[in-house]
Amino acid sequence: MPWERALETRGRSLETRGRNLETRGRSLEARKAGEPFAAQVVNVLAAAAASVVWDWSKVALVANADGALPGIQTYALLIWNGRGFEGWMPAEATEDLNRVLARWRAELERLSRPVWAALFVGVVNDGGRLRSRWIAADDGDCGAWRIRLGESNVPMAERGLAGL
């Protein structure tokens, strides 16, 4: 797909570091199981952002799977030139992202580990070198990472990106 090749054609590095910042109560096995999936999410986000604008600076993703609605709900914010943009992600990237997120949850279930109800993934593009952070929340109400329909989710995304 064209958005997948966006970073390759520009020769950008896809160096990522998947880290779970909220490790209390999460087993090492569950954290290790999440790292490859977090890296895949980072790759999808970075390629999708590069397909929209080559010199993007930050991307934030929040995903909710609270059971009240079918599937996984996602919210993505792209920061470019100091401004935030919503609704930017190509449909193909959204589909790929949802597949990765569903496989991540399925793997945690297979391991009989707590499955995240909410997830934050932030990525910073520093001249083609990527830094990332992921935070999983397994409390049923999604906590600080609940996507609010009909409200601005920008402050939540910016809070997750702070200090990254």
Give the ranges of each region predicted by the language model:
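Acidic, proline/glycine-rich low-complexity IDRs
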Residues: 1-4, 122-164
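Leucine-rich tandem repeat or coiled-coil scaffolds
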Residues: 3-4, 25-34, 41-42
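Long, intrinsically disordered low-complexity tandem-repeat segments
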Residues: 5-28
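Short, surface-exposed loop/turn motifs that are enriched in glycine and acidic residues
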Residues: 30-35, 90-94
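N-terminal, charge-rich interaction modules
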Residues: 34-67, 73-74
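Short glycine-rich, low-complexity/disordered patches
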Residues: 51-66, 107-126
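Extended intrinsically disordered, low-complexity coil regions enriched in Ser, Thr, Gly, Ala
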Residues: 65-96, 131-143
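Short, solvent-exposed interaction modules
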Residues: 89-118
